[in-house]
Swiss-Prot record:
Disulfide bonds: none annotated. The keyword Ribosomal protein does not apply. Keywords: ATP-binding, Cell membrane, Ion transport, Membrane, Nucleotide-binding, Potassium, Potassium transport, Transmembrane, Transmembrane helix, Transport. Its main location: membrane. It is a single-pass membrane protein. It is found in: Cell membrane. Belongs to the KdpC family. This is Potassium-transporting ATPase KdpC subunit. Coiled coil: none annotated. The keyword Cell membrane applies. It comes from Bacillus cereus (strain ZK / E33L). Part of the high-affinity ATP-driven potassium transport (or Kdp) system, which catalyzes the hydrolysis of ATP coupled with the electrogenic transport of potassium into the cytoplasm. This subunit acts as a catalytic chaperone that increases the ATP-binding affinity of the ATP-hydrolyzing subunit KdpB by the formation of a transient KdpB/KdpC/ATP ternary complex. It comes from the Bacteria. The system is composed of three essential subunits: KdpA, KdpB and KdpC.
């Protein structure tokens, strides 16, 4: 019996020690470092309006349906963050073909002047998460004609807006050149006022 207690005692102490270290101390240290070094990222990269209300995050896409605004990527989860993920159909899956055809039909309705062959792939396909906040600069540019026609904002102004909101690859190496749709639409909204 005494031998059992001598074995259990260190096990219980080690378990408790690691519970405190890994469950309390480590998370608090990492949270403190994140808040000190990169507060914006640690808080979720939130975007605020003029009234200091949260209107979104730079990291999570939103569904823009108003034809006067730029539209993001297709999302099979309708941009619901709690349902993150996508129906990652294989290229041979007929459901993928149906989904892409549906996206193309919607595109044609809203952008009749742009040939389907010029529609960038990121406007008719899902991202892996279904929450991608960015599109390619080309995907933004092909929407300029529709937006200009509906808002009466000159195409050149919209193209400059896209250029101003275009971000390069991280550290010049990682990722693609991209445009954050929420940030782009917020700048567009300023022009509409």
């Amino acid at each position: 019996m005494a031998k059992k207690q001598s074995i259990l005692s260190p096990i219980i102490r080690i378990t408790f020690t690691f519970l405190v270290l890994c469950g309390l101390v480590y998370p608090l240290i990492i949270t403190g470092i994140a808040q000190a070094v990169m507060k914006d990222n640690a808080d979720g990269s939130l975007i605020y309006n003029d009234k200091n209300e949260v209107i979104g995050s730079k990291l999570i896409g939103q569904n823009f349906t108003d034809p006067r605004y730029f539209h993001g990527r297709v999302s099979s989860i309708e941009y619901k963050a709690e349902a993150s993920g996508s129906n990652n159909y294989a290229p041979s899956n007929p459901d993928l073909e149906k989904r892409v055809e549906k996206s193309i039909e919607e595109w044609k309705k809203q952008n009749p002047s742009v040939p389907v062959t010029e529609v960038p792939i990121d406007l008719v396909t899902n991202s892996g998460s279904g929450l991608d906040p960015d599109i390619s600069p080309k995907a933004a540019s092909v929407q300029v004609e529709r937006i200009s026609k509906l808002t009466k904002i000159p195409k050149e102004t919209l193209e400059q807006l896209i250029q101003d909101q275009t971000e390069g690859a991280a550290l010049g190496l990682f990722g693609e050149t991209r445009v954050n749709v929420l940030k782009l639409n917020l700048e567009l909204q300023k022009l509409l006022k």
